[in-house]
Amino acid sequence: MAGAGERKGKKDDNGIGTAIDFVLSNARLVLGVGGAAMLGIATLAVKRMYDRAISAPTSPTRLSHSGKRSWEEPNWMGSPQLLNRDMKTGLSRSLQTLPTDSSAFDTDTFCPPRPKPVARKGQVDLKKSRLRMSLQEKLLPYYRNRAAIPAGEQARAKQAAVDICAELRSFLRAKLPDMPLRDVYLSGSLYDDLQVVTADHIQLIVPLVLEQNLWSCIPGEDTIMNVPGFFLVRRENPEYFPRGSSYWDRCVVGGYLSPKTVADTFEKVVAGSINWPAIGSLLDYVIRPAPPPEALTLEVQYERDKHLFIDFLPSVTLGDTVLVAKPHRLAQYDNLWRLSLRPAETARLRALDQADSGCRSLCLKILKAICKSTPALGHLTASQLTNVILHLAQEEADWSPDMLADRFLQALRGLISYLEAGVLPSALNPKVNLFAELTPEEIDELGYTLYCSLSEPEVLLQT
């Protein structure tokens, strides 16, 4: 009665709030925990829609401080934006109000007839089995028709990359013999047969040779910036080996080897010193440096409608640490080198699949294709998806092809959980949060898109 009295003064309230509260408070007795949770979600949605309908349009509680729609306005309002933390909190709070312990109810005063648990469980299991089989039947055709790259296209793109790599290697040896470099080599998902949809990008690693006694790497978490997964490369022993003792002293900024300055050095070589049109005519390609901001990227047209982008990526190795000049998303960290984990991640994934003929790589490629084809999921990277699969591989042992649908759904749920926490630890280096460079708004949008797909995951395969 107290609840009803409090709601009495609400504008135009006809008692629906009291009815909803009564339904929610007794749902546990009739439906059980799972049914009560689902009823809670549905009832909360109806209740909010009703409240929104009877509230004044200018009500300040309907908009966030920024004026944007928030989690209080779900997807039926036509907003593609992700649910924010306010609605997550509201939804969690609403579900938490549902009783979950049978001891909380007085069974002497209210003993409704219990449904047959065995029959109900059997119906639920049958429905889940049918949904899983339906999804399983759709995942493999999606991979064949949408994700997999035709073998011919993949071979031609690889050959174009090999030709460009050979030309650059010859140029560097002939024109820049004093530059201490190891041989350049190809890397990336195309090279590792993990690229999807179209063969359109590959990395060309340019390894710098650094004197081990003149340089050291400092983990980002040990600096004032506190950025795990990144390193500073410090110039050592300047009192014994003055500036100029190392070729790469010319790229030192503030006592540290600057990846940006190194990249600028190679940009002059890639864009200014090499006659790419002449090389392209010799190889029967159209080659040109990509426009800014892709300063260290070549665009190669190897067929009339086929383009390959080759990223030049300077790299340094100090001890067991391999770093690449791939900048942090925030400009304030442009003096940091990124820890290279991709080769080790790919090797672990391949080794796991080879050991049991599993479908981990297949599941990863389907997820990558979905993200590449869905603009709302475009901020998810191959590294993040790979680590979701690696974490799941530690929890689940059976990765036979028949389990593809189950593992796919588990990967989606796991990804949503990581997004909700805002943390995706690297499977190889747990100190590294792979979501650290995403903004809260991007995390919300990604989480909402995936959250909405859980009820009907086939929608993701239709993009």
Swiss-Prot record:
Cited Gene3D superfamilies: 1.10.1410.40, 3.30.460.90
Protein name: Mitochondrial dynamics protein MID51
Keyword Zinc: no
Matching PANTHER family: MITOCHONDRIAL DYNAMICS PROTEIN MIEF1 (PTHR16451:SF12), MITOCHONDRIAL DYNAMICS PROTEINS 49/51 FAMILY MEMBER (PTHR16451)
Cellular component terms per the entry's GO annotation: mitochondrial outer membrane; mitochondrion
A Pfam family it matches: MID51-like_C
GO MF assignments: nucleotide binding
Superkingdom of origin organism: Eukaryota
Cytoplasmic side: 47-463
Subcellular location field: Mitochondrion outer membrane
Phosphoprotein in keyword set: yes
Record-annotated disulphide pairs: none
The entry's keywords: Membrane, Mitochondrion, Mitochondrion outer membrane, Nucleotide-binding, Phosphoprotein, Transmembrane, Transmembrane helix
Bilayer topology: Single-pass membrane protein
Region (Disordered): 57-79, 104-123
UniProt family annotation: Belongs to the MID49/MID51 family.
Subunit structure: Homodimer. Interacts with DNM1L.
Chain segments carrying region Dimerization: 49-195
Function: Mitochondrial outer membrane protein which regulates mitochondrial fission/fusion dynamics. Promotes the recruitment and association of the fission mediator dynamin-related protein 1 (DNM1L) to the mitochondrial surface independently of the mitochondrial fission FIS1 and MFF proteins. Regulates DNM1L GTPase activity and DNM1L oligomerization. Binds ADP and can also bind GDP, although with lower affinity. Does not bind CDP, UDP, ATP, AMP or GTP. Inhibits DNM1L GTPase activity in the absence of bound ADP.
The organism's taxonomic lineage, starting at the top: Eukaryota, Metazoa, Chordata, Craniata, Vertebrata
Residue positions where Phosphoserine is found in the record: S55, S59, S79, S94
Region annotation (Important for interaction with DNM1L) ranges: 160-169, 234-243
Biological process according to GO: mitochondrial fission; positive regulation of mitochondrial fission; positive regulation of mitochondrial fusion; positive regulation of protein targeting to membrane
Residues given in the record as ADP binding sites: S187, S189, H201, S340, R342, K368
Residues in the Mitochondrial intermembrane compartment per record: 1-23
Residues annotated as transmembrane: 24-46
Species name: Pongo abelii (Sumatran orangutan)
